[in-house]
A protein has these predicted regions:
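A short, Lys/Arg-rich alpha-helix, primarily the initiator
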Residues: 1-14, 52, 62
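DNA major-groove recognition helix of helix-turn-helix/homeodomain DNA-binding modules
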Residues: 45-64
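Short alpha-helical DNA-recognition segment
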Residues: 17-34
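Short amphipathic recognition helices of helix-turn-helix/homeodomain-type DNA-binding modules
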Residues: 63-73
Length: 73
């Protein structure tokens, strides 16, 4: 199963966003996105919900993202 760090990176790449652009969209710092993607910190539940809401608002279904990624391995 895809972990949160890989999910953040996958969503960001699908939307063709830089870490800085994603950070602005989520109202967090660039450093925060970088730390999430590199597994240096675990985001709070609130931050994770914000990310999932962002995905939903951008028409990315997280469960299907997980399934799609598993099929490409």
């Amino acid at each position: 199963m895809m972990g949160f760090p890989n999910m953040v990176k996958e969503v960001r790449q699908r939307l063709k966003l830089s870490q800085k652009q994603l950070a602005q969209a989520l109202s967090v710092s660039y450093t925060t996105i970088n730390r999430w993607e590199n597994s240096h910190v675990v985001p709070s539940n609130l931050a994770q919900k914000s990310f999932y809401d962002f995905c939903e608002n951008n028409f990315i279904d997280v469960p299907s993202l997980l399934t799609d990624k598993e099929h490409t391995k």
